[in-house]
């Protein structure tokens, strides 16, 4: 499924089953108006002070309140055109109309590069081309030019991760999402509480609502959804965690997008 965010939806087959053949057909673009999304992330320093989003920021995700350009910069001069690290980075998100937008920028090391496109949401970034390191040479941050919040990280942990690790997403305009799977894991045998939060931005002053609440101790847990949750266009999704001791936690979710 490679990138798994914005699969082209072309074809003429009508879906008729719920087994693995159906999900494979969606991934192969066999169904008109259907696409799949796989989101996953990690929070390396979960604590007990309050819920945090499962992303590299180790905090609640700072959801933007308006559309803005983005500033992209690395901690290493090697992440640059002609460098040994990341040379180009693709950013994926939503524009002012909540439609999917992507932009590929050429890195300039420790000097910030500003996008030409404006973004209302950012839900993934990845290294597209790289030098001899075959990934990023240091942490790359993507920051809102207006609110100055870091909205995405491409992490570096001995080696570059090559893309963001963030279990947050927003349903694009003209789509409806159906959540079919959740998974969570933690690094310590201590109590972790996970909650799956959504916010419908079609509603003025929309509140966050919890759709799933799970407790787990050390290891991996997965839930295949049969009573499937529905998320309408412009809905924010945020997988969050809290722990009774400092630990790392990861998690993700899968959903099917269907054209309205």
Protein language model features and the residues they cover:
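A signal for long, low-complexity, Ser/Thr/Asn-enriched, surface-exposed stalk/shaft
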Residues: 1-5
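Beta-strand-centric surfaces of beta-sandwich/beta-rich domains
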Residues: 8-11, 15-121, 129-260
């Amino acid at each position: 499924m490679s990138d798994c965010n914005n699969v082209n939806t072309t074809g003429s087959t009508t879906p008729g089953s719920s087994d693995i053949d159906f999900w494979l057909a969606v991934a192969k673009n066999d169904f008109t108006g259907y696409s799949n999304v796989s989101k996953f992330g990690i929070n390396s320093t979960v604590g007990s002070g309050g819920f945090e989003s499962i992303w590299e920021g180790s905090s609640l995700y700072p959801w933007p309140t308006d559309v803005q350009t983005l500033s992209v910069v690395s901690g290493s001069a090697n992440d640059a055109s002609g460098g040994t690290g990341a040379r180009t980075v693709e950013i994926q998100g939503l524009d002012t109309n909540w439609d999917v937008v992507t932009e590929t920028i050429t890195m300039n090391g420790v000097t910030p590069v500003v996008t030409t496109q404006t973004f209302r949401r950012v839900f993934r970034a990845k290294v597209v081309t790289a030098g001899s390191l075959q990934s990023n040479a240091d942490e790359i941050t993507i920051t809102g030019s207006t609110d100055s919040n870091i909205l995405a990280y491409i992490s570096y942990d001995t080696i570059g991760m090559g893309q963001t690790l963030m279990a947050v997403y927003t349903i694009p305009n003209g789509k409806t999402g159906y959540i079919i799977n959740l998974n969570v894991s933690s690094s310590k045998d201590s109590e972790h509480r996970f909650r799956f939060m959504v916010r419908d931005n079609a509603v003025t002053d929309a509140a966050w609502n919890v759709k799933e609440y799970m407790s787990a101790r050390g290891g991996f847990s997965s839930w295949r959804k049969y009573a499937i949750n529905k998320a309408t266009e412009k809905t924010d999704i945020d997988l969050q965690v809290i722990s009774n001791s400092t630990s790392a936690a990861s998690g993700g979710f899968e959903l099917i997008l269907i054209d309205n």
